[in-house]
């Protein structure tokens, strides 16, 4: 079978988001997982920022991975991927000028779409919730991303977090990002369909939801009716790989019992050592957390 080009895959992604259906992403974190996802019939994959941090650095999701490290992983995936892959490009690795560089590099890597979020990063230790940048700065980042794009087939999605801001602010952000020219809007933290209806009113571009498996949003037909074209439940495949690796190596060492009771979440916490980063934040950033 002929290999699809990067532009072919970008056109495929645009066809998905122009349809009347909602598609669920495969967690794609390396070339092998990209091939598996395509072979199993997934229409779209996603390289998560948090997963890339785990895969490349064995580090927690504290915005520690650099653009070059993320792009290197995306490039490895782009060499073999035969399904469109979305890159979770976090905050674009800096200001609007950094966003432009991010878009250029990820486009060269072969990514079909990317998301730019309005989260204030790196992590603001010592705060109860994650802050967002101003809407004006978020709009500037989207405009910069569109300016930097060379292939018009690559999709640029703006992303915001509806869980930590009032509904009216979420509506305003979504509408302003749409007006700035974003090809789609990614929303994290939607509670239920009523919440989605409020925030998506007036949105005409495709929606992507990051649901983390929220059972209130499991009606795929209803999601599609409300304009959701891509749904990200999380990265279960990656965490299953962590668990399988641990159990296999543990068995090879003939440690008592062939299986461990530790969950993938517990293993991830153990081996990313987040307490070290919290301690460094206390020590060097005058943070009490």
Curated annotation (Swiss-Prot):
The keyword Glycoprotein does not apply. Pfam families: PEP_mutase. It is an enzyme of class 4 (lyase). Belongs to the isocitrate lyase/PEP mutase superfamily. Oxaloacetate decarboxylase family. Its cofactor is Mg(2+). It comes from Pseudomonas savastanoi pv. phaseolicola (strain 1448A / Race 6) (Pseudomonas syringae pv. phaseolicola (strain 1448A / Race 6)). Keywords: Decarboxylase, Lyase, Magnesium, Metal-binding. InterPro entries: ICL/PEPM, Oxaloacetate_deCOase_bac, Pyrv/PenolPyrv_kinase-like_dom, Pyrv_kinase-like_dom_sf. It catalyses: oxaloacetate + H(+) = pyruvate + CO2. Its EC number is 4.1.1.112. This is Oxaloacetate decarboxylase. Catalyzes the decarboxylation of oxaloacetate into pyruvate. Seems to play a role in maintaining cellular concentrations of bicarbonate and pyruvate. Binds 1 Mg(2+) ion per subunit. Mg(2+) binds at residue 88. CDD domains: ICL_PEPM (cd00377). Homotetramer; dimer of dimers. GO terms for biological process: oxaloacetate metabolic process; propionate catabolic process, 2-methylcitrate cycle; pyruvate biosynthetic process. Substrate binds at residues 50, 159, 235. It comes from the Bacteria. GO terms for molecular function: magnesium ion binding; methylisocitrate lyase activity; oxaloacetate decarboxylase activity. Gene3D superfamilies: Phosphoenolpyruvate-binding domains. SUPFAM superfamilies: Phosphoenolpyruvate/pyruvate domain.
